[in-house]
Amino acid sequence: MTELPVAPFERILKKVGAERVSRAAAEYLAEAFEEIALEIAKEAVDLAKHAKRKTVKVEDIKLALKK
């Protein structure tokens, strides 16, 4: 189960054209998003540590997204 709220994912699905969205579909999208976001965050933290920083910067996120 995801820690993220499901309503924003229902809105995203509707924004791209879904007329109706099941709760299960929105929850599944939220879980998938959370998994991807965690991987990006882990990579960004590693990049910040490698640069001997405690603060994760936008540049770390951008670089993590490229990997």
Swiss-Prot record:
| Region (Interaction with DNA) residue spans | 20-22, 54-57
What is a GO molecular function of this protein?
DNA binding
The protein's matches in SMART domains, at most eight in alphabetical order, are given as:
TAF
Record bears the keyword DNA-binding? yes
CDD domains documented for this protein: HFD_archaea_histone-like
Spell out the GO cellular component terms annotated for this protein, sorted alphabetically and separated by semicolons.
chromosome; cytoplasm
Compartments where located: Cytoplasm; Chromosome
Q: Which family does it belong to?
A: Belongs to the archaeal histone HMF family.
Q: Write out the function statement from the record.
A: Binds and compact DNA (95 to 150 base pairs) to form nucleosome-like structures that contain positive DNA supercoils. Increases the resistance of DNA to thermal denaturation (in vitro).
What quaternary arrangement does the UniProt entry report?
A: Homodimer or heterodimer with another histone. Dimers then assemble into higher oligomers, with the DNA wrapped around the protein core.
Write down what this protein is called: Probable archaeal histone 4
The uppermost taxa in this organism's lineage are:
Archaea, Methanobacteriati, Methanobacteriota, Methanomada group, Methanococci
